[in-house]
């Protein structure tokens, strides 16, 4: 099957799960308090991610391009829980999380390559805070670990997809 568009993001951490800081404790969240501030960074067992703004930017991108999500994060060890974390963090149920990449020795680019050989698609973006994406470095929109997906990342990903679709 040829997928119309795939949207990959390789890590939850540094993409949609970033270190969030608050002045006041946030209700129903496990926070680390230090120096008068409250810090939030989630783990899979929290059943959510910390940066709900980044989740909304991801959702907007998916809706705009009718894109699906393939998880390449280490959180994919428990795929169902990883999906639950996304939806619990505000991702609309209309956005499909369709699969995860295989576990291979080496780097993420090889895992994405293995997945693409089984599921070819003409246009995709990799959202990641790392750069081990060969042979798909041209599809990478690199995020900053501390901020994840922002409006600037969204705009870069949008432009990259538009460029791929116009060829």
Q: Where are the language model's segments positioned?
A:
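Short His-Asn-centered micro-motif
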Residues: 10, 72-75, 127-129
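Tryptophan-centric aromatic hotspots in well-structured domains and transmembrane helices
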Residues: 17, 22, 75-76, 114-115
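Short, charged/polar micro-motifs that form catalytic or ligand-binding hotspots
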Residues: 48, 72, 143
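Generic, well-ordered alpha-helical segments
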Residues: 50, 74-78, 104
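C-terminal cap/substrate-recognition subdomain and adjoining C-terminal extension
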Residues: 80-167
């Amino acid at each position: 099957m040829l997928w119309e568009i795939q949207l990959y993001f390789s890590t939850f951490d540094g993409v949609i799960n970033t270190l969030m800081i608050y002045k006041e404790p946030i209700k129903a969240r496990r926070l680390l308090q230090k120096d008068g501030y409250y810090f939030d960074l989630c783990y899979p067992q929290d059943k959510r991610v910390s940066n709900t703004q980044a989740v909304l930017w991801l959702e907007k991108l998916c809706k705009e391009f009718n894109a699906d999500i393939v998880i390449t994060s280490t959180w994919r060890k428990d795929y169902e829980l990883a999906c639950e974390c996304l939806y619990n963090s505000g991702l609309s149920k209309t956005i499909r999380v369709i699969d995860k990449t295989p576990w291979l020795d080496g780097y993420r680019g090889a895992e994405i390559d293995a997945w693409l050989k089984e599921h070819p698609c003409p246009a995709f973006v990799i959202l990641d805070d790392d750069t081990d994406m060969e042979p798909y470095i041209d599809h990478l929109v690199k995020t900053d670990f501390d901020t994840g997906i922002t409006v600037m990342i969204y705009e870069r990903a949008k432009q990259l997809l538009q460029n791929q679709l116009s060829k």
